[in-house]
Amino acid sequence: MADTRGSTSSGGGDDRGREGHDDFTGGGQYNRYHRILEAVPSPLVRRENGVHHQYPTGLIHHPSSTMPVAPCSYVPRYTMVPTSAMLPLQHHHRQLQISQENFQDRVPSNNVAAPHLPSNFQDLRPMCNGPPFMSYGQTASNRNVLYQNLTPYSFNAWASNNMPRNPVYTSYHPTAIEDPHATPFHINNHDTDQGFFTVSTSFRVDQSFVHAPSPFPPVSSSSRSFSSAQISNGPIDAKKAKKSDIKDQPIVLRRSDTESEKNDELDQTPASEPSSMSHNSANSTIRFNCREYRVILRKELTNSDVGNIGRIVMPKRDAEAHLPALHQREGVMLKMDDFKLETTWNFKYRFWPNNKSRMYVLESTGGFVKQHGLQTGDIFIIYKSSESEKLVVRGEKAIKPNVIMPIVDCSCKNDLNNSEECGFAISLLTKKT
């Protein structure tokens, strides 16, 4: 028996011991490995085991119960577990010594190894060090990952790398780190045990102590809330200021503007009425004696007369009877004194041939129309002296829409006194409806 256990007393014992050792490490290692697997019962991971494994005693603190967390509905997630493969010799040797080792977990916050504590994973060690985990560890070691030897860190490496992340719990409130006595809220949602697949479907490991940066600024009680109108006050005020600079000048719509568009003529902007126009007819009697002057032409101005062309069409009958006779088309220049202003106007009097007839016009009247502010419907009057044959021009504004052509008569206090200077009296002729 001593020879069989490895004694060196006899050659036969040495041969049997060497042969048994060769059976374990040589050609019989495959059969030996499967016998060990058959001898290990399949563990059932219960709820309390999952809780202990999520939060080992003294290593990871439970999150704070005061943190508001929305409950998540259970959705089964299945993870493909790698199949068993041929293991190196050092893994078989370490698998036999698993009961002699202690687990060391690294805290994710400071990456410092925790002290050796009594093992709380006796029921999970056969599962964590089985062929599925070893094959996964071997694959990870070939990829030059941090955990090259997965025996002490097999479960942590498998859970953090192979398990699906929970998209809800990404970070915890800082009180989860400071409160070690808080009740755990990570529990399995299963009412019944589901065997080995309980780990791969319901077990969840969250990196609770790794702070996830937020793209939004922190909100505090001292933060002020602004409305959209308050935020956009600056640009809106600037735009209003720019628009106000443009719109400061008032827009005045005149009657001649709309009427000139109908006749396809340029705009005629009337000038302001001079202060001398507010004088009564008594001032005019000083310059003109109504006994000497008489009205030879009256016309109600049209759109073309007050247009920018500066031309007034004269009534044919009155023009041929009282104005100078025209022998040439080019016409003649006529000087007329202003009835209200101390100025003299130079107009060109000419005619146009029109179907074997003539149309008489008075040109260069734009300045006179602007000076008196004449518009469509106003009255244009020409006086002629019976003694000197001087011409006097007058423009009168229409007082009412239904009043046309004021009648200008000579008014004297004493008609029998011929030496008395008489003034002009205006009487309105109402339009017949």
Swiss-Prot record:
Q: What subcellular compartments does it reside in?
A: Nucleus
DNA-binding region(s) from the entry: 297-399
**UniProt biased composition (Polar residues):** 269-283
GO MF terms held by the record: DNA binding; DNA-binding transcription factor activity
Q: What is its main location?
A: nucleus
Domain of life of the native organism: Eukaryota
Q: Which UniProt keywords apply?
A: DNA-binding, Nucleus, Transcription, Transcription regulation
Basic and acidic residues composition bias: residue spans: 13-24, 237-265
The entry's cellular-component GO terms read: nucleus
Q: Which InterPro entries match?
A: B3_DNA-bd, DNA-bd_pseudobarrel_sf, LEC2-like
For the region Disordered, what residue ranges are annotated? 1-29, 216-283
Q: Where is the composition biased (Low complexity)?
A: 216-229
Q: What does this protein do?
A: Probable transcription regulator that binds specifically to the DNA sequence 5'-CATGC-3' of the IDE1 element found in the promoter of the barley iron deficiency-inducible gene IDS2.
Q: What is this protein called?
A: B3 domain-containing protein Os04g0676600
What is the species of this protein?
Oryza sativa subsp. japonica (Rice)
